[in-house]
Amino acid sequence: MCAGTFDIIHPGHLFYLSEARKYGDKLIVVVARDETSKTFKGKHPIHNEKERLEAVRMLKIVDEVVLGKQGNIFDIIEVIKPHVICLGYDQNVQKRQLEDELKKRGVKAEVIRIDSYMPHLYKSSKLKK
């Protein structure tokens, strides 16, 4: 499982998804809600959550795509119960904090941080300028 805003899909996202795909038989992608994205990034995405959901759904590498839950970002993890959670290199969640929260919730998932792919070129905040 991996998650993100996926506002303007670019090669960095594709790298993240393809690397995450290597860690399981099925790739489930959680697309952040508009309000969640605003909370974490300080602004609304260019594309709304339904548009971003559909864009990710069109990617052949993705087996399933869902919208995140409103409120607590961990609630969707309890629903999906993944074996592996892949974090992007620039996602602010600390691996150790995530592992502790998963343990509290009884979710047994390995947490992996995916390396960056040319972040000087492919980072959504840079592409939007």
Where are these regions (language model features)?
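Nucleotidyltransferase catalytic core that binds NTPs
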Residues: M1-K129
